[in-house]
Amino acid sequence: MFSIEPGNREGPPGSLTEPPRDIVVIGASRGGVEALKGIVAALPPSLQSALFIVLHISPTHVSLLPDVLSRAGPLPAEHGRDGTRVERGRIYVAPPDHHMTVGPIGFIRLDQGPKENHTRPAADPLFRSAASVYGSRVIGIILTGGGSDGTQGLIAIEQAGGLAIVQDPGDARDPSMPMSALLHDNPDLCLPLSEIPGVIIRLSSVSQAST
């Protein structure tokens, strides 16, 4: 696997080529496990992107989400560990009771800072850090869940030139998080869950070995 260096990777001046969208950050809560399984199951093993996932979970619960996602699709999933270099083709899951962010030199950072939106881990810290470090290369996705977590982070992603995607509230088990984003932001896309993997694949840098 190859690490993903920070910064924008724009095409040359005047180029019609967009930068690869190789950093995918996802926030979810109630109903999120099934939604996440549906996304990762549809991704190819050659996907040259890193996925970061925040699923709201009680600090006292044991998170089995990496195992669940590794079984659901071809990409290996693991809990994010402080100091781990970001690599392509991997899924990083925020561990219970820790915010997961991306540091300025492309390493994962974990902390137990104040809860945001009444939760830790929260999507907003992850989204903000990804926008700051990777800019227009980021795809931010808000899935089913209660509350408003992810809304402010999605705004930061758009302001940095990244792409904002929201699950269609009518398609979500709990529409609160998607509705919050739609009410307070202007996401680029509002899609049913089944269409989100295709967008990730089209906009991410995919290995030529798969073509």
Regions found by a protein language model. Give the residues of each.
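Strand-loop microenvironment adjacent to phosphate/nucleotide-handling motifs in alpha/beta enzyme folds
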Residues: 1-211
